[in-house]
Amino acid sequence: KEMTDDKTYNKAKTMENTLIKGELKKLMKNTNDWLVDIGFGEENLAVFTLRGQSPRETYELGDNLRFFVEKVDRGDEILTKDKSGKTKKKKRGVKISLTRSSKEFVKCLVERQLREEIDNGSVVIKAIARQAGIRTKIAVDTKKSDTDPVGATVGKGGCKIQSVMNEIGGEKIDVIRYNEDPIVLIANAL
């Protein structure tokens, strides 16, 4: 059992700070947190906390969604007895925290959508600010002098950024040109 927990923990730990898909399995009435099946079995359901939920979105049992894996920890402590009869504490299972409200979630969605542009240096994401459910601002730059990073991020007719906006419930996303001068950056953001 302990070896299974270690394997599950190690596998889950590699998913930290990445996007995953999961199915909403149970709403915890006292906290409004959701338990989410991400493929680790009933004993290791992930937790989609109220804090990680976007105020713009509504969730229903059975929804299949993308999440950002915020944190992976050992599960809850339990008391067990070893072979000699001594009581000891040990952690059982895995605790996986998910979010859809963080700026990291949006960053991963944008990186997924712009994989080619990021890989070839046309787009470099420099900063993201997010007010979940209201608006996200993304500051982009480029390593290429002949490329407009804002246009490359938005895509023809807005198709690339629209795909990300759809994933986050229609929340508005502003893409601005990055500048090292904070005054210019703020002016670009307004």
Residue ranges of each PLM-predicted region?
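RNA-contacting regions in translation and RNA-metabolism proteins
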Residues: 1-190
